[in-house]
UniProtKB/Swiss-Prot annotation:
GO terms for cellular component: ribonucleoprotein complex; ribosome. The keyword Lipid metabolism does not apply. NCBIfam families: L28. GO terms for biological process: translation. GO terms for molecular function: structural constituent of ribosome. Belongs to the bacterial ribosomal protein bL28 family. It comes from Pseudothermotoga lettingae (strain ATCC BAA-301 / DSM 14385 / NBRC 107922 / TMO). This is Large ribosomal subunit protein bL28. The keyword Zinc does not apply. Keywords: Ribonucleoprotein, Ribosomal protein.
């Protein structure tokens, strides 16, 4: 399953956990993706994986149930 927003393309970013003793271990920062039903430009309804930033910005129009 893709961990990428279908609207803006935001995906996982590599980083490090840093402990109190300053040891570094690798980790991933993943976007907060939600599976929602969206009305597309051509008027069809389909399920998309969209990040919460795009949802809050109003870049997608949710389909009613």
């Amino acid at each position: 399953m893709a961990k990428r927003c279908e609207i803006c393309g935001k995906g996982p970013v590599a980083g490090k956990n840093v402990s109190h003793s300053n040891r570094h271990t690798r980790r991933m920062f993943r976007p907060n993706l939600q599976k929602i039903r969206v009305i597309t430009e051509d008027g069809t309804v389909r399920t998309m994986r969209v990040c919460t930033r795009c949802l809050k910005a109003g870049k997608v129009q949710k389909a009613t149930a």
